[in-house]
Amino acid sequence: MKNKIHKYDFLVVGAGLIGSLTALNLCKKNFSVLVVDKNIELPKDDRTLAVNANSKDFLKNIGLWDKLKTKPSPIEKIIIKDNINSSPLIFENSYEEMGNVVFNKELLSKARNILEQKKILIGGLNIDIFNILPKKNILIKGKNYF
């Protein structure tokens, strides 16, 4: 049996939140993408993420926002304190939300589900990125990258 060779526009190394969202955005722009990670188990993570209006639009555009089961909590008030000034700086808006709070784990879970449905997520691969990078510098807009 002959091995089939797949060609991709992008290889995303790391299926964490940033890698998964990057891959979904590239797919949305009709690029072929492969996402690899050594461990694709969801982390035991109860952290939350504050999402501003632009980020919310981005998540809607890649099809994630409406898939969240837990209703995002609106941010209606922001209090900024420091140890120099005694008075806090308070931003309050009762007319519209200034952002939302979502659970990292749920966002990552939904992103990974989409990647798995598209069959572009591979786990169990420990890739040494330095072994796949070009062996010469790359010039982009007058800057050298290696």
Predicted regions and their residues:
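Beta1/beta-strand and adjacent pyrophosphate-binding region of the FAD-binding site
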Residues: 2-18, 34
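Glycine-rich FAD pyrophosphate-binding loop
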Residues: 11-13, 25-47
